[in-house]
A protein has these predicted regions:
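Generic alpha-helical secondary structure signal
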Residues: 13, 40, 171, 202-206, ...
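Domain-terminus/edge residues, biased toward the C-terminal soluble/receptor-binding domains
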Residues: 217, 234-432
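Active-site-adjacent loops and short helices of periplasmic peptidoglycan-processing enzymes
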Residues: 60-243, 253-256
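Short secondary-structure junctions and interdomain/linker hinges
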Residues: 53, 184-187, 344-348
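Intrinsically disordered, low-complexity segments enriched in small/polar residues
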Residues: 4, 26-30, 58, 64-65, ...
Length: 432
């Protein structure tokens, strides 16, 4: 198994010198934009890439992602709605140095990489760390996802993508985090930092850097809670590498809250007139090739960045691409990676395959057949071992009850589990 290559310990001084080089390298008018591709342009790119693939592009879209139900739109068709409009449009990138990428399975098997250790501005990918730090504080009991948090003068009118709010508007902390991962709302990111940092955003950013260090992200430095450019913050760019962002993404998809929120196609809030304000996900690849998240990011000096996480059967992949010139290129490059992956995937077991008999403790039948709930794949060149686990169910069994697990292992380490389901109803002993 190959892990991210070339990562080295870097002091803050070393990182600061890299930032200076990056700032000097990237020139051009900051803040100016031109119209971006239309949605139909992006759909054409997606459809063209999908046509090149022999496999069904929806393969791997499962009813559950990591134990969390795949999310559906929250729009109520019976209520009036308005779609949110960005304050500013994304434009052309001024970054012209070539793509940076790191694509690997969750367990670290590298599928593709290029300039993966080159430091680069990451724009709104920064918000993933914002969310990770906040969830750490939730786990410690310092804040709650149910906290009612209100916008104030310091956090309301942050530029770029934003929630259309006014001072005094209040939201649950959970919904602010959802707005970060789904819509990339900058004012939400600042309000979260203000709330978790107890009124001090700099304190929160220090927590972001400590979390990066704890994860082993040795070439990453955060200056803001949202990833906005220097022209808007007066601070250095938030920077990282493709290989470091893979590490961050792996931590993110280990959290079921993030998996759930990242898979939502839209964010819906009711305004004071009972009108639904709809903020559509910026991830246009949801539910293609098993993609269920994770985050996009753009400013002119960073280009178009994107991390996606995909689950196809037992195979989970993280793909990091930085520095695309346009949104269309960002989409196209991600689809090419998954098209290449599809050509390397070998079906080991079909969904519904009979995996043998499983024990029942207190049923009229002592054994029952179990079938796989999902497909099992291997990537050519990356063989797995498999282990069947009998749960020896002691309760009532209905058709579809989980009665076992198929574990996928690599070098003895657990990679993933797929449920094995009962094929019939079985009554308990003594029942009529």
């Amino acid at each position: 198994t190959e892990a991210p290559s070339g990562a080295t310990e870097s002091s803050d001084d070393t990182i600061d010198s890299i930032i200076d080089e990056t700032n000097n390298e990237i020139t051009g008018s900051e803040g100016g934009t031109v119209p971006s591709e239309t949605n139909s342009d992006i759909e054409n790119i997606i459809n063209a890439e999908l046509e090149k693939t022999k496999l069904d592009p929806t393969q791997g879209v499962t009813p559950k992602v990591g134990g969390v139900e795949t999310q559906k739109s929250k729009i109520d068709p019976k209520k009036p709605l308005q779609y949110a409009v960005d304050r500013e449009k994304e434009g052309l990138s001024k970054y012209k140095e070539g793509l940076l990428k790191f694509v690997a399975t969750k367990e670290g098997y590298v599928l593709d990489k290029n300039l993966e250790n080159k430091v680069h501005p990451i724009a709104s990918l920064t918000k993933v760390m914002n969310i990770l730090v906040t969830l750490d504080e939730v786990e410690k009991g310092n804040v709650s996802l149910e906290d009612n948090v209100c916008f104030n003068p310091q956090t309301t009118n942050i530029g770029g993508s934003w929630l259309n709010v006014k001072i005094g508007d209040c939201y649950k902390l959970k919904d602010l985090l959802r707005s970060e991962i789904i819509y990339s709302a900058n004012n939400s990111a600042y309000l979260v930092a203000y709330h978790v940092g107890k009124g001090d955003i700099e304190t929160f950013v220090k927590k972001m850097n400590q979390k990066a260090k704890d994860l082993g992200m040795t070439n990453t430095k955060f200056y803001t809670p949202a990833g906005l450019p220097t022209s808007m913050t007066g601070k250095n760019f938030d920077i990282s590498t493709a290989s470091d962002l893979y590490i961050m993404a792996k931590a993110a998809i280990s959290n079921n809250n993030i998996r759930e929120w990242a898979s939502e196609p839209d964010l819906v809030f009711l305004n004071s007139n009972n009108i639904q304000i709809v903020y559509k996900s910026r991830n246009k690849l949801l539910n293609r090739y098993g993609i269920y998240g994770l985050k996009t990011g753009f400013h002119e000096q960073a280009g178009y960045n994107m991390i996606v996480a995909s689950k196809q059967g037992n195979i989970e992949v993280i793909s990091v691409i930085l520095g695309a010139n346009t949104e269309a290129q960002r989409i196209s490059e991600q689809l090419k990676e998954f098209r290449a992956l599809s050509s390397r995937m070998k079906l080991v077991y079909s969904k519904g395959k009979n995996m043998g008999q499983f024990n029942l403790k207190y049923a009229v039948k002592r054994k029952i057949d179990g079938v796989l709930s999902d497909k099992i794949y291997e990537i050519v060149g990356n063989n797995y071992e498999y282990k069947i686990k009998d749960l020896k169910i002691k309760t009532v069994v209905k058709k579809g009850t989980v009665i076992g697990k198929l574990e996928t292992l690599k070098d003895g380490n657990l990679v993933s589990t797929v449920d094995i389901l009962a094929t019939e109803d079985v009554k308990e002993l003594g029942s009529v």
